[in-house]
Amino acid sequence: MCFVYRDVLTDLFDRGEGRGMAVRSQVEVFDEGGTLLCTNRCTTLFPTLGGYGGQPMPRGASPIPERDPDLVIDDHIGAAQNLLYRLTGDTNLVHVDRDVAVSRGLDGPFVHDLCAYGYVCRLATAQLFPGHPEKLTRMFAAMKTVLYPDTPVQLHLWKLEEGKAAFRFVNAQTG
């Protein structure tokens, strides 16, 4: 089977001097017959390109309720998770090479954001739709910090209206 991808840059945002630029894109995936299979939306940050006077990044309201989560799920990011994720085709050395990561102001190699996103998806699906992963049809996240390998994590889930939930994925040691 062959897939056709249509990738469109939809927005550029100036996060300010020293804060970078954000690029939003939308990728539509079609099968050979032209049927739309899924749409992926992504915001990519370029930390060195801000401060050019462009449109500022809009602030979205956080959907997380001001109450304790309905569920807290404990898990652990393995010590080699960043290396395993590299097998998907990630070639960015910041995820595997300590010297590269440190040169960019990080403590060391970190787990790719999409890998962390996958953890959230797996944990949330197992709790909200046990045995029925096909029921998860949309998921949105904003990454706020890096996640290092060999880290205990928690997924905090808030059940909202029918078919919707909010979440926060955190380092269990630092919150």
Model region roles, listed by residue range:
Residues 99-174:
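Catalytic-pocket segment enriched in acidic/His residues
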Residues 1-73, 148-150, 154-175:
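HotDog/MaoC-like acyl-thioester-processing domains
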Residues 32, 44-111, 125:
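Catalytic strand-loop segment that frames the active site of acyl-thioester-processing enzymes
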